[in-house]
């Protein structure tokens, strides 16, 4: 087999359907668009959500809630991520340098997801009750 002899499998490729090319083709004249109406015309499609002039559903329903801007300043780190980090002392700066939290993060909390076997000393980082128990059980501390 040579590269210049490679072909698609038989029946894998077929010519595209050419519509509007005479009644003998079976899809001539109206070309599968039916008779008259907006959808039969060239460029005859409305934008998504348009309901013919009726107030669209998206605008009929009221707005709800808001997007908290505090989310970009708060971050969570799992015990599994701490385990893989492999540092004895962890603070916010170390987590930022490792890429575990964003550069804008001001508040970081450790959550109990996964296992921790190494002793880790946390400074300036919060922890949930379960995470704190797991860190202290592994010989670490939370300050």
From Swiss-Prot:
Q: Is ATP-binding included in the keywords of this UniProt record?
A: no
Which keywords appear in this protein's UniProt record, sorted alphabetically? Ribonucleoprotein, Ribosomal protein, RNA-binding, rRNA-binding
Q: InterPro entries, from UniProt?
A: Ribosomal_uL15 (IPR030878), Ribosomal_uL15/eL18 (IPR021131), Ribosomal_uL15/eL18_sf (IPR036227), Ribosomal_uL15_bac-type (IPR005749)
SUPFAM superfamilies, per the entry:
Ribosomal proteins L15p and L18e
Q: For this chain's UniProt record, which GO biological process terms are given? A: translation
A molecular function (GO) term: structural constituent of ribosome
Which residues does the annotated region (Disordered) include?
1-51
What superkingdom heads the lineage?
Bacteria
GO CC annotations on file? cytosolic large ribosomal subunit
**Compositionally biased intervals (Gly residues):** 21-31
Asked if rRNA processing is a keyword of the record, the answer is: no
Functional summary from the UniProt entry:
Binds to the 23S rRNA.
Show the NCBIfam families listed in the entry: rplO_bact (TIGR01071)
Q: In which family does this protein belong, per the annotation? A: Belongs to the universal ribosomal protein uL15 family.
Oligomeric form and interacting partners: Part of the 50S ribosomal subunit.
The identity of this protein, by name, is Large ribosomal subunit protein uL15
Which gene name belongs to this protein?
rplO
